[in-house]
């Protein structure tokens, strides 16, 4: 259980940081720069970050994780306060839907991926709870910034998948079948069920022109879950499609990490995360951030999420 919890949070963080190296680029641009795939966490990239540094995706996820450990429970208002703190911390990137939602103007038409990109810690924490409770929490968290029903339902399925994988030690194909059945049972919107079905045979048709769409991220994660031979290939394959690479890879990495566990995470990725300290005054740090956004304690944090007693 601990290994899969750690794999999930490591996958979230590593996928985010790795994808951040080529965010917004086309597949052709990425292949020219990385003919063998984007495989090492390094300084630089779209946001000129240091190796392993989280983008907005995982900064929000880290705050959610720390809140869950501190409080021993999920509360949407407590989560809102954490996300508001993040917004006020002058992040170097922030999606429009998140910004509008946290400023009191949520966009009910947006189907952006900003809720799913941060929610994986809730799946880890929720592994000891009934899946219907996990789904309720995930929908509440999405509604803070992404009230569209597609976003809420996709959040529920994704988080349930993480929680179930951590507790049941199921294989990838079994997990997909469970997610498909939950989608029928809830039931979810037809558009969401359609991409779940299509993930059996194909990845999203276009990662570029609607980049940032939650259904691209979710279909990709499910496709990689079914078809990738291992954790690393699933994350790298995701990034090579281009577009919103950091978020797509963070979501895919969290789901696959919950299946494959800590042992599947490349050593270079783990070492980079555990030594990533974007501290003010360091000559290589272009975006210094408060310590709560550093991923150095990722293994301990994931374990605490598993062991925290609900109050």
Predicted regions and their residues:
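Structured, active/binding-site neighborhoods that engage oxygen-rich ligands
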Residues: 1-311
């Amino acid at each position: 259980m601990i290994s899969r919890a750690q794999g999930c949070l490591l996958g979230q963080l590593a996928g985010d940081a790795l994808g951040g190296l080529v965010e917004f680029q086309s597949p052709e641009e990425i292949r020219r720069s990385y003919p063998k795939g984007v495989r090492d966490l390094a300084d630089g990239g779209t946001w000129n970050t240091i190796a392993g540094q989280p983008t907005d995706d995982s900064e929000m996820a880290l705050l959610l994780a720390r809140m869950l450990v501190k409080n021993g429970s999920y509360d949407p208002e407590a989560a809102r306060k954490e996300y508001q703190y993040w917004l006020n911390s002058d992040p170097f990137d922030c999606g429009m839907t998140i910004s509008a939602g946290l400023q009191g103007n949520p966009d009910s038409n947006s189907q952006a991926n900003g809720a799913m990109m941060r929610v994986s810690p809730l799946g880890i924490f929720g592994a000891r709870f009934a899946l219907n409770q996990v789904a309720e929490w995930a929908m509440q968290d999405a509604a803070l910034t992404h009230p569209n029903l597609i976003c809420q339902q996709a959040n529920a399925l994704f988080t349930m998948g993480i929680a179930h994988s951590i507790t049941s030690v199921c294989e990838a194909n079994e997990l997909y079948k469970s997610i498909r059945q939950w989608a029928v049972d809830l039931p979810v919107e037809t558009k969401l069920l359609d991409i779940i079905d299509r993930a059996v045979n194909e990845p999203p048709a276009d990662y570029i022109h609607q980049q940032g769409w939650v259904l691209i991220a979710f279909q990709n994660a499910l496709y990689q879950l079914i078809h990738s031979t291992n954790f690393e290939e699933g994350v790298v394959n995701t990034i090579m499609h281009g577009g919103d690479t950091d978020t797509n890879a963070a979501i895919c990495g969290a789901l696959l990490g919950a299946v494959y566990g800590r042992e599947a995470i490349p050593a270079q990725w783990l070492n980079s995360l555990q030594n990533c300290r974007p501290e003010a005054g360091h000559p290589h740090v272009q975006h210094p951030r408060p310590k709560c956004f550093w991923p150095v304690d990722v293994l301990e944090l994931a374990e605490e999420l598993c062991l925290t007693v609900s109050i």
